[in-house]
Design a protein with these regions (language model features):
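Flexible "cap/lid" loop of the alpha/beta hydrolase fold
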Residues: 7-12, 16-47
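Gly/Ala-rich beta-loop-alpha elbow adjacent to hydrolase catalytic centers
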Residues: 2, 6
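Conserved alpha/beta-hydrolase "acid-adjacent" motif
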Residues: 120-125
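Short, conserved loop/helix-junction motifs that constitute active-site signature segments
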Residues: 104-108, 131-133
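Catalytic active-site module of serine/aspartate enzymes centered on a nucleophile-bearing elbow/loop
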Residues: 134-168
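Conserved alpha/beta-hydrolase catalytic His-Asp/Glu region
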Residues: 31-33, 50-105
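Cofactor-binding loop segments of dinucleotide-utilizing enzymes, especially the Rossmann-like FAD-
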Residues: 25, 116-117, 143
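Short beta-strand/loop motif that positions the catalytic acidic residue
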Residues: 107, 113-115
Protein backbone atom coordinates (compact mmCIF):
# COMPACT_ATOMS: atom_id res chain seq x y z
CA UNK A 1 0.00 0.00 0.00
CA UNK A 2 2.99 2.30 0.45
CA UNK A 3 3.46 2.60 -3.31
CA UNK A 4 -0.10 3.89 -3.64
CA UNK A 5 0.52 6.57 -1.01
CA UNK A 6 3.80 7.63 -2.62
CA UNK A 7 2.22 7.83 -6.06
CA UNK A 8 -0.75 9.82 -4.73
CA UNK A 9 1.61 12.37 -3.14
CA UNK A 10 3.47 12.63 -6.46
CA UNK A 11 0.17 13.29 -8.25
CA UNK A 12 -1.06 15.84 -5.72
CA UNK A 13 2.23 17.63 -5.01
CA UNK A 14 4.77 16.87 -7.75
CA UNK A 15 6.90 19.83 -6.62
CA UNK A 16 7.61 17.94 -3.37
CA UNK A 17 8.79 14.72 -5.03
CA UNK A 18 12.11 14.56 -6.86
CA UNK A 19 12.20 10.77 -7.27
CA UNK A 20 10.35 7.67 -6.14
CA UNK A 21 11.46 4.20 -5.11
CA UNK A 22 8.71 1.61 -5.04
CA UNK A 23 9.56 -1.73 -3.45
CA UNK A 24 7.03 -4.48 -4.10
CA UNK A 25 4.74 -1.99 -5.80
CA UNK A 26 1.06 -2.63 -6.36
CA UNK A 27 -0.26 -0.87 -9.45
CA UNK A 28 -2.81 -3.42 -10.61
CA UNK A 29 -4.98 -5.97 -8.86
CA UNK A 30 -4.96 -9.04 -11.10
CA UNK A 31 -7.84 -11.52 -11.22
CA UNK A 32 -6.43 -13.56 -8.35
CA UNK A 33 -5.99 -10.56 -6.06
CA UNK A 34 -9.46 -9.23 -6.93
CA UNK A 35 -10.93 -12.65 -6.17
CA UNK A 36 -9.13 -12.70 -2.81
CA UNK A 37 -10.45 -9.25 -1.94
CA UNK A 38 -14.01 -10.30 -2.79
CA UNK A 39 -13.61 -13.53 -0.83
CA UNK A 40 -12.25 -11.56 2.12
CA UNK A 41 -15.18 -9.15 1.96
CA UNK A 42 -17.55 -12.09 2.29
CA UNK A 43 -15.79 -13.77 5.23
CA UNK A 44 -14.29 -10.78 7.06
CA UNK A 45 -17.18 -10.52 9.50
CA UNK A 46 -17.42 -14.30 10.00
CA UNK A 47 -13.84 -15.36 10.73
CA UNK A 48 -11.25 -13.69 12.97
CA UNK A 49 -9.49 -10.97 11.01
CA UNK A 50 -6.04 -12.36 11.84
CA UNK A 51 -6.96 -15.64 10.14
CA UNK A 52 -7.90 -13.73 7.02
CA UNK A 53 -4.75 -11.62 7.19
CA UNK A 54 -2.55 -14.70 7.68
CA UNK A 55 -4.27 -16.42 4.77
CA UNK A 56 -3.73 -13.40 2.51
CA UNK A 57 -0.08 -13.19 3.59
CA UNK A 58 0.41 -16.83 2.64
CA UNK A 59 -1.27 -16.36 -0.76
CA UNK A 60 0.85 -13.28 -1.57
CA UNK A 61 4.08 -14.78 -0.18
CA UNK A 62 3.74 -18.58 -0.46
CA UNK A 63 7.33 -19.79 -0.69
CA UNK A 64 9.62 -20.97 2.08
CA UNK A 65 12.04 -18.07 1.43
CA UNK A 66 9.14 -15.60 1.98
CA UNK A 67 8.56 -16.80 5.55
CA UNK A 68 10.36 -13.88 7.20
CA UNK A 69 8.27 -11.39 5.19
CA UNK A 70 5.07 -13.30 5.93
CA UNK A 71 5.75 -13.29 9.67
CA UNK A 72 6.55 -9.56 9.60
CA UNK A 73 3.36 -8.89 7.65
CA UNK A 74 1.25 -10.76 10.22
CA UNK A 75 3.12 -9.32 13.23
CA UNK A 76 2.47 -5.78 12.00
CA UNK A 77 -1.18 -6.63 11.32
CA UNK A 78 -1.61 -7.62 14.96
CA UNK A 79 -1.11 -3.95 15.81
CA UNK A 80 -4.34 -3.15 13.96
CA UNK A 81 -7.60 -3.44 15.80
CA UNK A 82 -10.39 -5.32 14.03
CA UNK A 83 -12.22 -2.07 13.20
CA UNK A 84 -9.08 -0.58 11.58
CA UNK A 85 -8.50 -3.80 9.66
CA UNK A 86 -12.07 -3.75 8.28
CA UNK A 87 -11.61 -0.10 7.23
CA UNK A 88 -8.27 -0.92 5.56
CA UNK A 89 -9.83 -3.91 3.83
CA UNK A 90 -12.71 -1.80 2.53
CA UNK A 91 -10.17 0.62 1.03
CA UNK A 92 -8.50 -2.18 -0.95
CA UNK A 93 -11.77 -2.98 -2.68
CA UNK A 94 -12.04 0.63 -3.91
CA UNK A 95 -8.55 0.86 -5.42
CA UNK A 96 -9.10 -0.21 -9.03
CA UNK A 97 -10.02 3.20 -10.52
CA UNK A 98 -7.07 4.89 -8.80
CA UNK A 99 -4.63 2.16 -9.87
CA UNK A 100 -5.91 2.37 -13.46
CA UNK A 101 -5.22 6.12 -13.44
CA UNK A 102 -1.69 5.55 -12.06
CA UNK A 103 -0.95 3.05 -14.84
CA UNK A 104 -2.21 5.39 -17.56
CA UNK A 105 -0.50 8.60 -16.42
CA UNK A 106 3.28 8.96 -16.26
CA UNK A 107 4.06 11.57 -13.59
CA UNK A 108 7.45 12.19 -15.26
CA UNK A 109 9.28 11.81 -11.95
CA UNK A 110 12.25 9.39 -11.97
CA UNK A 111 10.87 6.18 -10.49
CA UNK A 112 12.59 2.94 -9.57
CA UNK A 113 10.44 -0.14 -9.15
CA UNK A 114 12.22 -2.84 -7.15
CA UNK A 115 10.33 -6.11 -7.42
CA UNK A 116 10.94 -9.70 -6.41
CA UNK A 117 11.18 -12.24 -9.21
CA UNK A 118 8.72 -14.42 -7.26
CA UNK A 119 6.13 -11.65 -6.78
CA UNK A 120 3.74 -13.44 -9.10
CA UNK A 121 0.74 -11.29 -8.21
CA UNK A 122 2.16 -7.83 -8.88
CA UNK A 123 5.35 -8.13 -10.99
CA UNK A 124 3.64 -8.66 -14.39
CA UNK A 125 1.77 -5.35 -14.23
CA UNK A 126 4.87 -3.48 -13.05
CA UNK A 127 6.83 -4.86 -16.01
CA UNK A 128 4.22 -3.43 -18.38
CA UNK A 129 4.10 -0.13 -16.52
CA UNK A 130 7.90 0.25 -16.52
CA UNK A 131 7.88 -0.23 -20.30
CA UNK A 132 5.15 2.38 -20.81
CA UNK A 133 6.41 5.12 -18.48
CA UNK A 134 9.58 6.78 -19.75
CA UNK A 135 10.53 7.96 -16.25
CA UNK A 136 10.34 4.45 -14.77
CA UNK A 137 13.04 1.84 -14.33
CA UNK A 138 12.54 -1.71 -13.09
CA UNK A 139 14.94 -3.88 -11.11
CA UNK A 140 13.89 -7.49 -10.50
CA UNK A 141 15.65 -9.26 -7.64
CA UNK A 142 15.96 -13.06 -8.03
CA UNK A 143 14.75 -15.52 -5.36
CA UNK A 144 12.66 -12.82 -3.77
CA UNK A 145 8.95 -12.29 -3.18
CA UNK A 146 6.66 -9.31 -2.64
CA UNK A 147 8.48 -7.72 0.32
CA UNK A 148 11.84 -7.25 -1.41
CA UNK A 149 13.42 -5.06 1.26
CA UNK A 150 12.91 -7.85 3.82
CA UNK A 151 13.70 -10.85 1.60
CA UNK A 152 16.95 -9.37 0.22
CA UNK A 153 17.73 -6.17 2.17
CA UNK A 154 21.36 -5.74 1.07
CA UNK A 155 20.55 -6.13 -2.64
CA UNK A 156 17.53 -3.84 -2.25
CA UNK A 157 19.70 -1.17 -0.59
CA UNK A 158 22.45 -1.52 -3.20
CA UNK A 159 20.01 -1.10 -6.12
CA UNK A 160 18.16 1.84 -4.57
CA UNK A 161 21.34 3.68 -3.57
CA UNK A 162 22.75 3.21 -7.08
CA UNK A 163 19.54 4.70 -8.52
CA UNK A 164 19.73 7.71 -6.18
CA UNK A 165 23.43 8.31 -6.93
CA UNK A 166 22.74 8.35 -10.67
CA UNK A 167 20.16 11.09 -10.13
CA UNK A 168 22.71 13.38 -8.47
Amino acid sequence: MGSILIRQIAESHPERVSSMIMGGAIMKLNFRSQFLIRFGNIVKSIIPYMWLYSFLAFIIMPKKNHKKSRLLFVREAKKLYRKEFIRWYKLTSELNPLLRFFRQVDVKIPTLYVMGQEDYMFLPSIKKLANLHKSAKLVVIPDCGHVVNVDKPSIFNEKTLRFLRKLN
